[in-house]
Amino acid sequence: DVYAFGVGALPQMTVPTRIGGRDGGDSHGMVGIGGKYLWSGDRHLNLIDVYDTGNGNIKVGTITLAGDVSNDPAPDLMDASPDGSYVFVALRGPNPLTGDNKEVHNAVGSTPGVGVIKVDGGGRSGKLVSIAPISRMAEEKDKDGNMVKKEKADPHGIQVRKK
């Protein structure tokens, strides 16, 4: 679920209000775009929901990430470029180290790395345009005791360095 709350009177805060989410979703990783939009990633459904923070936090769109660049990107944490024209997102791997519900595999992705999303409409929409792949192959025994190589890369954190 996605919640909004005021921080104008810190250290006191207002009671959080639910502004979005969905059954079967996994809201995970958020980034503010241009001071107007909030992007909330959903690892399990490969989506980013877009909320207009200047207009009552209403949901104004959904960005579908699965497609030509990756069939199962599993977006995690995100951060925007200094000029807000791109968002960089950690994409989970096929063998997540943490946060995976084994019944639904909500944290499993097919393309571990850093996704590059081109921001459109001032932050109202975007498109996954490329991935900088990350790989860490490791040998381990399969269920029959045979040695096999498995992808173990599982990025799930990111921060854009602003100079």
Task: Please report, for each region that a protein language model flagged, where it lies by residue.
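Predominantly soluble domains enriched in secretory-pathway, periplasmic, or organellar proteins
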Residues: 1-163
